[in-house]
């Protein structure tokens, strides 16, 4: 069992005012981003945070949380109702296959899905293992945005929003500023470009390499309307 104090350590490392965010989450008149600031705190969510903190770095973890924040807000705007626990856990683990510990000869999406399923199953969170793995495995495919499963669709949409700025025009500038201030972007573009370049170099037949053969992925990341 992961106690809530682990979340304070986890978010504290990201320089997030957890107590303030939680206090404002349901405050009357709180701005949209503040109301959305409360992250799922189920046992599975807390266990996943602790796991990710042990295997990843701050820049990647911030990207994962922003993926959830953008995905959740975009789902809300569209009237979609994803299971927030599934969406959050999938967001935290969606790039697990890019971590050296979990990398291998297969596509990083497949490796990440498998590692996420194994972790969740080993922790006893069987109800999440399959839906989280399903979302992770196809999160880089453009058609996934139209998937009828909202958790699958909005993981892909949230990740693309944070990486390239897609659909960012649906947000008021202050909402974007609040999310980025809470989970800073320093080093995000450099990290993602480097990780993708590595995947293409060592796996020229991979899914991400095929995408890069059609789209200048590095330019799309670099040109995203974010400072970092």
Regions found by a protein language model. Name each.
Residues 76, 97-101, 117-125, 138-145:
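Short helix-capping and hinge/turn segments at secondary-structure transitions, especially at repeat
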Residues 63, 80-86, 123-136:
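Acidic/histidine metal-binding catalytic segments
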Residues 67-69, 107-122:
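An active-site-proximal "capping" alpha-helix that borders the catalytic cofactor pocket
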Residues 56-65, 100-111, 126:
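Active-site metal-coordination segments of metallo-dependent hydrolases
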